[in-house]
Amino acid sequence: MSEDHTKADNLSEKDPHSPERSDSSSHEDAHAREEEESSDDDGALDGKPASLIAIVMIALSLAVFLSALDTTIVTVALPAISAHFNSTAAYTWVGSAYLLANAASTPIWGKLADIFGRKPMLLLANALFMIGSLVCALSINVGMLITARAIQGAAGGGLLTLVDTIIGDLFSLRTRGTYLGMIGGVWAIACALGPIVGGAFTSSVTWRWCFYINLPIDGLAFGIIFFFLKLKTPKTPILEGFAAIDWAGSFFIIGGTLMFLFGLQYGGITFPWDSATVICLLVFGVVCIVLFGLVEWKFARFPIIPLRLFQYRNNCGALLVAFFHSFVFISAFYYLPLYFQAVKGATPILAGVYILPAVLSTGVSAAATGAFIGNTGNYLIPMYFGMSMMILGYGLLINFDAGSGWAKLIIYQLIAGIGNGPNFQAPLVALQTKIKQSDIATGTATFNFVRNIATAISVVAGQVLYQNQLKKMTSTLQQLGPAASLIAAGDAGANTQAINALPTPQRDLARSAIADALSPMWIMYTAFAAAGLFCILLVSKTELTTTHEVTEVGLEAQKKAEAERKAERQAKDLEKAQKS
């Protein structure tokens, strides 16, 4: 299935250091690199002391841990924050500002890392994250807090993308799977620990510690990265570097993403889905994204998301698998806590504890997948295994009802979690097998951008389906009297205390209704997992090399790569002309 693609890749990925190049060209390139790069070595960690690898990976893991933790740490603290500032806007926007900025900024970080270097951009993202965290902790009004959360989110988008990119620079294709799996496990565990940590701080100290806690941890990560991470750092002139940024593409992708996600955020909550506001946001968001594609195709010299990433079936398959995997797995972290609070009567903190079977099994299976890929060089087996287990696990969640016992609740979560883990990073390894080393940053940023969009759409799709199911139960819910409005609104997550305070017969009826409304949602997620399984058929098998390939970064490297691509296109055009 992959033979043609492999041949095409071999043609398009000719070694830029092959003997075919002239001596003068090699001399010019060496001179350019000498002028451009600092004294850092090539950054390869393959074969380096295990202690050095451990130190660097701890720092990278801490950065990703904080980025993921802040995605969910405020969920339990939001009522206290809203009460402190006496603002209903805080309940919606303190959480959303982080997620929106995170998603919109992700594509930009990859190209910034190509132009200015990985290490400077990672340090910048860490610094911005610390600044945002400090301002959040010291906020004196809700506007200040929301703005700081947006800064945090933009930095958080850079942390995950840059860490994945740097691992691609530090290790060979064969080795990097181990460390990408580790990062995937850290991300999953941090996301799930957020509500527990946030709830503990809010109840025992103050909600401000949800942000203070980032400072010492991120400071430690910053210091380790600064002193121990050795990567080639280009001496790109600031003004020349900024002039090379695809500003038109940045405008359209950020604007389009924000409008689209704002439309999803407002739809069915702030405004009806058929309102002019929601329709305009969604339509113009899509239009901007289409215009972004046009800019990348025709006008951008150094595209943020180069369309050449999509020229191979393998790459499209890997991105589709990432989309469907993200669409499905986020549902467990988002809707299982709702089930435990609204149906099982758990507090927010206990709900976080109750989903630990899914969390821990996700983290362990992600790390185990990385080790498997590193030892065997096979990423397709984990992809098939993971999606198959997701189909089984999320299919079993359909059976969760008001009377489900703990054996069922734990075992079914474990199965779903085992399915979650493998496809956090295996599709990324698959993607990186078919792109040049010079495209690692933009490819990784595109991968994470697809994930962010998938999770945003997934949460809204689940909520819409859940609300529609409750509307079908109107006659049943009328037996609850005034409390029916709490359930029928589809906002049971915000009204769990009121539901749990109902008299026993009404409470049992409400819990059964919510559990029944969640079942069709799990059916949808199971179907999407099945779609993801079929998409793996598009992914080709490629031998993972153990040879480390040095990544050239900086503006001169971008210009050289552009010239090589132009020469390749001209050669192909000439070959076609000769054949015709």
Curated annotation (Swiss-Prot):
Q: How does it sit in the membrane?
A: Multi-pass membrane protein
Q: Where in the sequence does UniProt note compositional bias of the Basic and acidic residues kind?
A: 1-34
- Residues with glycosylation annotation: N10, N86
Q: Which residues form a coiled coil?
A: none
Give the induction text.
Expression is positively regulated by the dothistromin-specific transcription factor aflR.
Where does it live in the cell? Cell membrane; Vacuole membrane
Q: Which GO terms describe its molecular function?
A: transmembrane transporter activity
Record's GO cellular component, any one? plasma membrane
Inactivation phenotype: Decreases the expression of ver1, pksA and vbsA, and subsequent production of dothistromin, but does not affect the resistance to the toxin.
Can you tell me where the transmembrane regions are?
49-69, 89-109, 127-147, 153-173, 181-201, 209-229, 242-262, 275-295, 318-338, 348-368, 380-400, 409-429, 444-466, 519-539
Q: Return any one Pfam family short name.
A: MFS_1
> Which portions of the chain have biased composition (kind: Acidic residues)?
35-44
Primary localization:
membrane
Region of interest (Disordered), ranges: 1-45, 559-580
- Please provide the record's keywords in A-Z order: Cell membrane, Glycoprotein, Membrane, Transmembrane, Transmembrane helix, Transport, Vacuole
Purpose:
Efflux pump; part of the gene cluster that mediates the biosynthesis of dothistromin (DOTH), a polyketide toxin very similar in structure to the aflatoxin precursor, versicolorin B. One function of dotC may be to transport early-stage dothistromin biosynthetic intermediates from the cytoplasm into vacuoles, thereby affecting the rate of dothistromin production.
Family according to the record: Belongs to the major facilitator superfamily. TCR/Tet family.
Stated name of the protein: Efflux pump dotC
Organism name: Dothistroma septosporum (strain NZE10 / CBS 128990)
